[in-house]
Regions:
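Formylglycine-dependent sulfatase
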Residues: 1-189
């Protein structure tokens, strides 16, 4: 089977699953765990009290003590590659995120657009009955796709998340943030 045939088959199966999931009510298996992923930019591995660091984070400590501590993950020095690797389970270059989205180029591994052949974790969870949400900074969408007019096919709600509330780019104004609820602009009071 050629790579085209494999890709076409995988894409057809994914579409069939998505269509079936709308007809058949998919629920998580009995006893399935809740999944909460917290990514904090610019904080070193050993900084939080959960990992023996000096920053006291009692809520995170409580969550970590009753769950899984993810401590075997490669992070990069910038956020976009780390985010896309965490949310896909794949190396950042496989995800075409060699740097932050604003510095994307046409070079392989650095286009700033996750290939359709890499399934986002949220989509895998959704197809297994989980409800998914993304809140806060996204910074996984190529800079030329960050606009209320779209395209929005690489935004969180088109990558498996049922709910998104936050900002798409790498930064926003702290006093008058440019926020989205899904793909709709949030009007400031």
């Amino acid at each position: 089977m050629t790579s085209f045939q494999r890709g076409f088959s995988a894409q057809s199966c994914s579409r069939a699953l998505i269509c079936c999931s709308r007809v058949i009510d998919i629920t998580t298996p009995a006893g399935a765990p809740n999944v909460l992923i917290v990514l904090i930019d610019d904080m070193g591995f050993g900084m939080s009290s959960s990992f023996g660091g000096p920053i006291n984070m009692p809520t995170v400590d409580r969550l970590a003590s009753g769950g899984l501590r993810y401590n075997q993950f490669h992070t990069t020095a910038v956020c976009s590659p780390t985010r896309v690797a965490l949310l896909s389970g794949r190396n950042h270059h496989v995800n075409n995120m060699g740097g932050i989205t604003e510095t994307a180029t046409a070079f392989p591994g650095n286009t700033g657009q996750r290939p359709n052949s890499v399934a986002p974790l949220a989509e895998m969870l959704r197809l297994n009955g989980y409800s998914t949400g993304f809140f806060g900074k996204n910074h996984e969408t190529a800079a030329w796709e960050v606009s209320p007019s779209g395209p929005t096919d690489r935004w969180p709600t088109r990558q498996g998340f049922d709910k998104f509330y936050g900002f798409i780019g790498g930064e926003t104004n702290q006093w008058a943030p440019f926020l989205y609820d899904g793909t709709a602009v949030v009007e400031l009071p």
